[in-house]
Regions:
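Long, low-complexity, charge-biased intrinsically disordered regions
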Residues: 1-224
């Protein structure tokens, strides 16, 4: 089951172990959903609203629809490929800056009742969006991308006389490249990200994409 992916985000402190003085204990919940393509998803989500607000900011990368449209226009203008993908369990790629404890519930099977320390950016924690953003921003910089000034969640780099772009919406990516497959393979092989639904853009951020008979890319934002 997919919820087992989150179990590696905890440090087991043993049954009945007390949390340090001044720390709160929270619960986590298993949330089940069905994706637009029929895939089933289970996610372990923490009661982060019960924790204190982090001293640094909370942030998630959320490209605007306007920025996405401009990026797609540039792709068509320069005859570049337009791909999209979803990074599986993205938050769990980053470590959390918060120190949060929880008491394991029945979903943890034989560890029910144990005290667990969360050390990964679990969904629901206040700082998880920022930690994932920082993690993936480091990845893009390492590959040679820089954030654009007017749309910081669109990243760009010059390659062979053309500009390539990556639009980030939390863990959903749209990218415009001469060779999109190579970029996806770098994310998988070098950085070990788990990509899902990778390929020519057809559905992204609630929008359907298709090409007319003359090859024109059309965007229908009826679900945005």
């Amino acid at each position: 089951m997919s919820q087992l992916d989150e179990y590696g985000t905890f440090i087991d402190l043993g049954k009945g172990e007390k949390t340090p003085k001044g720390y709160k204990k929270i619960k986590v919940h298993l949330i089940f959903d069905v994706k637009h393509d029929g895939r089933h998803k289970a996610r372990c989500v923490a009661d982060g609203h019960l924790t204190d607000i982090p001293v640094d900011s909370v942030y998630s990368g959320v490209v605007s629809l306007r920025g996405l449209r401009i990026m797609l226009f540039l792709a068509e203008l320069n005859q570049l490929e337009t791909w999209a993908t979803d990074i599986g369990n993205a938050y769990l790629e980053a470590e959390t800056s918060e120190r949060v404890y929880l008491i394991a519930g029945p979903e943890f099977n034989e560890r029910e009742g144990y005290t667990l320390l969360i050390f990964k950016a679990l969904y629901g924690l206040r700082s998880s969006g920022l930690r994932w953003h920082e993690k993936f921003a480091d990845t893009l910089r390492d590959i040679g991308f820089s954030p654009s000034k007017n749309e910081p969640d669109i990243w760009m780099r010059e390659a062979n006389g053309l500009w390539e772009y990556v639009a980030v919406y939390v863990d959903d990516l749209a990218f415009v490249m001469k060779d999109s497959k190579s970029f996806a393979n770098i994310l998988i092989q070098k950085y070990k990200y788990k990509l899902k639904g990778t390929g020519n853009i057809s559905f992204h951020l609630g929008c359907d994409f298709f090409r007319e008979e003359d090859g024109t890319l059309c965007m229908v934002p009826h679900k945005y």
